[in-house]
Curated annotation (Swiss-Prot):
InterPro entries associated with the record: Peptidase_C13
A GO BP annotation: proteolysis
A single MF term (Gene Ontology): cysteine-type endopeptidase activity
Enzyme class: hydrolase
Name of this protein: Hemoglobinase-like protein 1
Transmembrane segments: none
Length: 20
């Protein structure tokens, strides 16, 4: 789940949900 935190912190929460 480290990648999720990195993406969410880099692009934002919306990006994390889109990736998931």
């Amino acid at each position: 789940k480290n990648w999720a935190v990195l993406v969410a912190g880099s692009n934002g929460w919306p990006n994390y949900r889109h990736h998931a």
